[in-house]
A protein has these predicted regions:
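A generic, residue-level signal for flexible/boundary positions that often mark functional hotspots
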Residues: 19, 95-97, 138
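Solvent-exposed, charged interface segments at domain starts and junctions
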Residues: 1-4, 60-63, 133-136
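Cysteine-cluster motifs in flexible loop/terminal segments that predominantly coordinate metals
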Residues: 120-146
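Nucleic-acid nuclease catalytic cores
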Residues: 26-123, 142
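Acidic-basic catalytic patches of nuclease active cores, encompassing PD-(D/E)XK
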Residues: 1-24
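A generic structural signal for short, non-catalytic loop/turn and secondary-structure boundary residues
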Residues: 14, 76, 131-133
């Protein structure tokens, strides 16, 4: 089973379900956590991520990172993803915006470039400075700005 990228009982159990929710993948081959969690995984190697905040470009890049990690684990191409934005307004039902994403070579390179920049900051112990614009929900906002 290990030759198919199934390195745990959880991986084997998850393959028995057609629509997999919260699939754990090993990102350590890419220098990431060994317990990455994608929100959902559909047959045909389609990654699905649910978001409740506003749409951001980095969401697509993160999806490419998940695809690379999954590919390194399974040796099966993962070229498609879906970002589903959930809006909870005053309306009686949530509004869903579904964004299909082609995970192409450019998006993969964008992820690798960002990963390499982050690793260089950590390895060189270089202070990246204060961001030009902070995300309103950043957990480090008080620490950086003071």
């Amino acid at each position: 089973l290990s030759r198919y990228g199934m390195n745990s009982k959880d991986s084997i159990a998850q393959l028995s379900v057609m629509y997999i929710v919260e699939r754990i993948i090993d990102g350590s081959r890419l220098g990431l956590s060994n317990r990455l969690m994608i929100d959902a995984f559909e047959p045909g190697n389609v990654l699905v991520e649910f978001k409740t905040g506003r749409e951001e470009d980095f969401h697509k890049i993160a999806l490419a990172g998940y695809a690379l990690a999954l590919e390194s684990e399974t040796n099966v191409p993962t070229d498609y993803g879906v970002l589903i934005y959930i809006r909870l307004n005053s309306e009686p039902y949530p509004k869903l915006n579904v964004r299909p994403i082609l995970i192409d070579e450019e998006l993969r390179r964008d992820f690798i470039d960002l990963r390499d920049q982050a690793m260089a900051i950590v390895l060189n112990e270089k202070d990246p400075g204060i961001a030009y614009k902070c995300h309103p929900q950043c957990p480090y906002k008080d620490y950086c700005i003071g």
